[in-house]
């Protein structure tokens, strides 16, 4: 009996071993990744956990589709074009002297950093000088070169200076805009011996009619300025004749171009004008004190200085035996 069992066992043993080996090999093979089947709920969760019903109708709806937000593109409105930047017209009287080119160079270096500025340079001469012509050609600035001589009788000490030159600049502006619609612009008188902060040009560009601000190193004081209360000019802090209608320096105001064009007879006067009264005589023709627009933080910041170049000492300049090279200074 036992021998029969052992014989059957040994007959089945190889087959059992083969089955075990096959099962072991099959279990060692990497199982394919399980791909979860998508589940579409008939309800979608909205903000705050609220359950939203499915969308019905429309090309994107269908059985098994949940609610989804469509990001439909809408045409954007075109931005409005920015208004043109007002042009600043700077009228600069100048005359021949040893420091002329140095003064103009300093001024040009400032103007070159100001956007939309047109320089009107007016020589006190019967003709344009080669020095100024060459200088403007290399200055890299939009400019106009004018000339008009001061009559000999008005060159005496104590009389107003640069009257004819400023009037020539005003006449050029009016003639240029006579037959065309004037673009926004601002005019100011920039003497070639002044020093300007770039912030001043930002302030004056928003001038509606006539704007004013302090001036440093003028009138025998560290500064002069309009006195302002509640945004209005009520007086003048000045070291000379505070009774003037406009006790202000030529470097202390700017005028809208439209005001200049609307007052074609407004000029600087020779007859009847007293020394130091040119600013008042001019401004009386175009505005009143009540209409003045204070700039520079209600006229509490100095952004322009009435600097003066020291008189040059040329005592050692030779009259004979000159340099063999002619150099422009």
Swiss-Prot record:
It is found in: Golgi apparatus membrane. Its cofactor is Mn(2+). Residues 45-87 are annotated as: Disordered. The active site is at 279 (proton donor/acceptor). It catalyses: 3-O-(beta-D-galactosyl-(1->3)-beta-D-galactosyl-(1->4)-beta-D-xylosyl)-L-seryl-[protein] + UDP-alpha-D-glucuronate = 3-O-(beta-D-GlcA-(1->3)-beta-D-Gal-(1->3)-beta-D-Gal-(1->4)-beta-D-Xyl)-L-seryl-[protein] + UDP + H(+). Its EC number is 2.4.1.135. Residues 1-2 are cytoplasmic. Involved in the biosynthesis of L2/HNK-1 carbohydrate epitope on both glycolipids and glycoproteins. This is Galactosylgalactosylxylosylprotein 3-beta-glucuronosyltransferase 2. Gene3D superfamilies: Spore Coat Polysaccharide Biosynthesis Protein SpsA, Chain A. The lineage of its organism: Eukaryota, Metazoa, Chordata, Craniata, Vertebrata. It comes from Canis lupus familiaris (Dog). The gene is B3GAT2. Homodimer. Pathway: Protein modification; protein glycosylation. One of its GO terms (molecular function) is metal ion binding.
């Amino acid at each position: 009996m036992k021998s029969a069992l052992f014989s059957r066992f040994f007959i089945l043993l190889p087959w059992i071993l083969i089955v075990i080996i096959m099962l072991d090999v099959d279990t060692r093979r990497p199982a394919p990744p399980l791909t979860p089947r998508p589940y579409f709920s008939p309800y979608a969760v909205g903000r705050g956990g609220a359950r939203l019903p499915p969308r019905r109708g429309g090309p994107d709806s269908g059985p098994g589709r949940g609610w989804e937000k469509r990001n439909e593109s809408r045409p954007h409105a075109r931005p409005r074009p920015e208004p043109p930047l007002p042009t600043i017209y700077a009228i600069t009287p100048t005359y021949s002297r040893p420091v002329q080119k140095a003064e103009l160079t300093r001024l040009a270096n400032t103007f070159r950093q100001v956007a939309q500025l047109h320089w009107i340079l007016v020589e006190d001469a019967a003709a344009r000088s080669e020095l100024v012509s060459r200088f403007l050609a290399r200055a890299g600035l939009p400019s106009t070169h004018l000339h008009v001589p001061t009559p000999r009788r008005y060159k005496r000490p104590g009389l107003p200076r640069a009257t004819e030159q400023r009037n020539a600049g005003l006449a050029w502006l009016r003639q240029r805009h006579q037959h065309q619609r004037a673009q926004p612009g601002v005019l100011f008188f920039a003497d070639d011996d002044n020093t300007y902060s770039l912030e001043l040009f930002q302030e004056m560009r928003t001038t509606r009619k006539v704007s004013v601000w302090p001036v440093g190193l003028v009138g025998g004081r560290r500064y002069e300025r309009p006195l302002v209360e509640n945004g209005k000019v009520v007086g003048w802090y000045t070291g000379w004749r505070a009774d003037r209608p406009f006790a202000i320096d030529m470097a202390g105001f700017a005028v809208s171009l439209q005001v200049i064009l609307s007052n074609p007879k407004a000029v600087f006067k020779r007859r009847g004008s007293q020394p130091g009264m040119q600013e008042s005589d001019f401004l009386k023709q175009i505005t009143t004190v009540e209409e003045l627009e204070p700039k520079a933080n209600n006229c509490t910041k100095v952004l322009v200085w009435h600097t003066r170049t020291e008189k040059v000492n040329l005592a050692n300049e030779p009259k004979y035996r000159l340099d063999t090279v002619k150099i422009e200074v």
